[in-house]
Amino acid sequence: MRIVQVAVEFTPIVKVGGLGDAVASLSKELAKQNDVEVLLPHYPLISKFSSSQVLSERSFYYEFLGKQQASAISYSYEGLTLTIITLDSQIELFSTTSVYSENNVVRFSAFAAAAAAYLQEADPADIVHLHDWHVGLLAGLLKNPLNPVHSKIVFTIHNFGYRGYCSTQLLAASQIDDFHLSHYQLFRDPQTSVLMKGALYCSDYITTVSLTYVQEIINDYSDYELHDAILARNSVFSGIINGIDEDVWNPKTDPALAVQYDASLLSEPDVLFTKKEENRAVLYEKLGISSDYFPLICVISRIVEEKGPEFMKEIILHAMEHSYAFILIGTSQNEVLLNEFRNLQDCLASSPNIRLILDFNDPLARLTYAAADMICIPSHREACGLTQLIAMRYGTVPLVRKTGGLADTVIPGVNGFTFFDTNNFNEFRAMLSNAVTTYRQEPDVWLNLIESGMLRASGLDAMAKHYVNLYQSLLS
């Protein structure tokens, strides 16, 4: 099959959150047996991207706020074709130093219009797979009866909380026809459109990234017109849980670790624990944490409202009260939250057991996965989550809120601990206390939790197989 993946993130070329990881992992796995091309907008931060082979270069026109010119360079990249599209006559839209900015709807709709024009001239694809609201306009553009692309369209919701509300006039500035434009419009306000709503109606199949998240989306009434769209498309909507690249995330070969190990040491638990403790000792020395404090609980996360920052703060208090170590590695574009955590960072700078690292450092994060005994993921919403899968592979027990993919992958008493009520700090604190007590007093139970996590199948092959089966069913 020829499969085209379209997204605005692709790790490691451009990454902000889990979207880039998910798109890259799926694309690379599918490319082992299929012809895969990834379309990505050009950002200044990837201007130095190079590849051993440029496959093609082309210029073309697209329609968005007038007739515009774009160019596309296709590279051979890790078994697939990576095509970077530059909006030459609207270059200012992607001139920012960050991936996301205030005019995201305009920027990404322009990219979608250019991608549609590119696909109309490219080798025909069997499947065009769109990732999240950013490229939602592309679903309607590809259905244009005057110049249709005869590919089956799959749309994946990675985060239902972000939907792409915009003016209908903006979308009409592309080549979308009136019929398909109507799918994007809100009935209650025809001057407003929603990129995700149109993508739901214009795609041949919709997926999201976990089974529980499907039900959470169906039960989300925050916008009744989006809810109606989900119900209308429910027969072609399912969840396929993400996986992780087990070659990239491998404690046996990870160069960021002070001491490497893997699941084969589960038969020698003393050796396994010693290796994790050696990583912890190196991390403690690096961050100036006293060796008197253990276990070590970590948070590795963006600091945004949906990730539960209030619970991150609560861990600090709990760690002080119960004399264990806590490390937070996180970034935030929310100035209010960032300032709150910077103030905490300053206040805790001399703490013997608490460290807040407010920038993302991949080698440090990897070492922390290995050194930590537990990782806490207190998200209000988490479509799938890769953090808990990575942590379990590194022998680190997840403490999570029972939501989305966290609920599907972390089973209390089997491979982790859970809480549910976001309005109940007592339940959250009880989970922390239970986990710390189990670590300190029940080593056999703790080993079983680690074993279940390390042996869990979290690779990409199962995810890719589900998608291949879906693609084939659409083509049959």
Curated annotation (Swiss-Prot):
One annotated GO molecular function: alpha-1,4-glucan glucosyltransferase (UDP-glucose donor) activity
Keywords carried by this UniProt record: Glycogen biosynthesis, Glycosyltransferase, Transferase
GO biological process: glycogen biosynthetic process
Residues binding ADP-alpha-D-glucose: K15
Endpoints of the signal sequence: none
A Pfam family annotated for this UniProt entry: Glyco_transf_5
Biological or metabolic pathway of the protein: Glycan biosynthesis; glycogen biosynthesis
Catalytic activity: [(1->4)-alpha-D-glucosyl](n) + ADP-alpha-D-glucose = [(1->4)-alpha-D-glucosyl](n+1) + ADP + H(+)
EC number of this enzyme: 2.4.1.21
TM region(s), chain numbering: none
Enzyme class: transferase
Similarity comment text for this entry: Belongs to the glycosyltransferase 1 family. Bacterial/plant glycogen synthase subfamily.
Purpose of the protein: Synthesizes alpha-1,4-glucan chains using ADP-glucose.
Name the record gives this protein: Glycogen synthase
